[in-house]
Amino acid sequence: MSQVHIHPVPADYKKQTLMDRETYDRWYSQSINDPGTFWAERAEQLLDWKTPWDTVSEWDFNEGRAAWFKGATLNACYNCVDRHLPERANQTAIIWEGDEPDQDKHISYQQLFEEVSKFGNVLKNRGVKKGDRVVIYMPMIPEAAYAMLACARIGAIHSVVFGGFSPEALKDRILNAEACALITADEGVRGGKTIPLKVNADKALDGIDCVHTCLTVKRTGGDVDWQAPRDVWYHEAMADASSDCEPEWVEAEDPLFTLYTSGSTGKPKGVVHTTAGYLLNTALTHKYVFDYQDGDIYWCTADVGWITGHSYIVYGPLANGATTLMFEGVPTYPDASRCWQVVDKHKVNIFYTAPTAIRALMGLGDAPVEQTSRASLKLLGTVGEPINPEAWEWYYRVVGDSRCPIVDTWWQTETGAIMIAPLPGAVDLKAGSATLPMFGVQPGLMDPDGNELDGAASGNLVLKASWPSQIRTVYGDHQRLIDTYFSAYKGCYFTGDGARRDEDGYYWITGRVDDVLNVSGHRLGTAEIESALVLHPSISEAAVVGYQHDVKGQGIYAYVSLMAGKEGSEELVKALRDLVTQEIGPIAKPDLIHFAPGLPKTRSGKIMRRILRKIAADELDSLGDTSTLADPSVVDQLIDNRQNK
């Protein structure tokens, strides 16, 4: 392994941070040895409760069950908005930076309270009640956050669907969630282009009976079809709504939201997060991982359609009374300096983005960064996938001027909040390492036979004890939760990731070990992409694997077998990419398509994906044993025609 570059925390920086190493060690030890006391103290410190809990936690990983703060009642919206009004009514809660550099808004906590309260009444006036599911299919505009908080206020369960998903993908999620309402916009705007959200929503709703309301925000004023009485303009409904909307006090374990994530079986799974544990852990991690202090301007570049947007644009920051920035655009529009121009414009102190964005910006050179000041920055973060040390060093040296610590955070949709990360004032940084576990997190490394590995080792990453923001179930299919996360290693949660632990106890995430790709920080199931490809009448079979991509982290490599009499062509490549875009969305479009005369299969008919991964990676000297294949000659043909030479 190449030499690891260690970056000690500067002494003057340590003095200003919320947590030093001694405090981290003490808190972490208590969180493992006396979790009841630890989490009770954090719950009192960070959240407001209507009624107290009976028990802090009870869990059984064999059954995939966990409950935190049972007996307590609270409201997530109240904790994110109302309780801040006495001291923060005039403080900016959300800075919105539009796609064009001359568009921005500052929304105070008082304004946020009024908008969300009205929005809650709009939903109630349309018959949405506690426990109902509401799908949100929105661009990155303040109304997306209002919608989430309004649902939480009235006890409805939101399910945000990323605006880049296709009508078919949206339809699947609406049906699975059994939603009664959809909140969307006429169009989204991103990188100077419009996204036809209402058109997509109309296609998705075609033939669906459960949705009685489609509330539409006017973002661009573009032409849209209208279906009364289902369709309602947001601005018209809000004009008549009262701002008096009492929060619905819910049980600690009542669901806050469902968020769909890719699985290895091809059918997206609805990850259910509940109110108290999720809100507590997002508040805790936002405060200490980002060393958030009063007055800081915090910017997470994620989309609210992903878990990072839920936890670290909306719930975590607002629970802490922070100022959070929402960005509608992309890092390279109108030019490659945009991110750093936004940092200077709004005096951003904390910047949290994905390695994919860092690598893309690194590829455009230092000049777009260096023509800006960035003097306000004090902390940088990364999320979504492992960051390679070269990109880490560039981010540290060029973006942060070698003075801003980087928090490389590992977590998942299912974990709800950051699980492994360095605390900026407490530990020395190693480029590319996610570092140390957060409070209450007990990681373990397992070998393929299920034996736990001690000391410095590499293996499959598991979590050995429950944590407050843990996934509670897969919506409508608890058995799938058990099969996916709690069956591989008895009594442990299996993350699906591989990891290495070094001699200092630092963790290094090595990537997925299951059939899920991590493309630009977005999880995509290979089976879902394969299912889309074989819809084409020329394709008999498809197998999708990941390969190393300089910008995206992982690229999508699709092997496709043709029907008899069909031939591969550039036209067919385009048609297949368009088909995947239509079925899932542009993020799932294959980078490389390899027309294969056959796929390597065992005699029982199982595709040997290990071999396909090796060929896609151009690692031809480590294919391993191919003698068990039904037709070993297929491998030579695949090698000769490989797309990633």
From Swiss-Prot:
CoA binds at residues 190-193, 308, 520. Keywords: Acetylation, ATP-binding, Ligase, Magnesium, Metal-binding, Nucleotide-binding. Its EC number is 6.2.1.1. It comes from the Bacteria. Disulfide bonds: none annotated. One of its GO terms (cellular component) is cytosol. The modification N6-acetyllysine is found at residue 606. Its cofactor is Mg(2+). Mg(2+) binds at residues 534, 536, 539. Acetylated. Deacetylation by the SIR2-homolog deacetylase activates the enzyme. It is an enzyme of class 6 (ligase). One of its GO terms (biological process) is acetyl-CoA biosynthetic process from acetate. InterPro entries: Ac_CoA_lig, ACAS_N, AMP-bd_C, AMP-bd_C_sf, AMP-dep_synth/lig_dom, ANL_N_sf. It catalyses: acetate + ATP + CoA = acetyl-CoA + AMP + diphosphate. PANTHER family: ACETYL-COENZYME A SYNTHETASE, ACETYL-COENZYME A SYNTHETASE 1. Belongs to the ATP-dependent AMP-binding enzyme family. Catalyzes the conversion of acetate into acetyl-CoA (AcCoA), an essential intermediate at the junction of anabolic and catabolic pathways. AcsA undergoes a two-step reaction. In the first half reaction, AcsA combines acetate with ATP to form acetyl-adenylate (AcAMP) intermediate. In the second half reaction, it can then transfer the acetyl group from AcAMP to the sulfhydryl group of CoA, forming the product AcCoA. This is Acetyl-coenzyme A synthetase. It comes from Alcanivorax borkumensis (strain ATCC 700651 / DSM 11573 / NCIMB 13689 / SK2). The lineage of its organism: Bacteria, Pseudomonadati, Pseudomonadota, Gammaproteobacteria, Oceanospirillales. The gene is acsA.
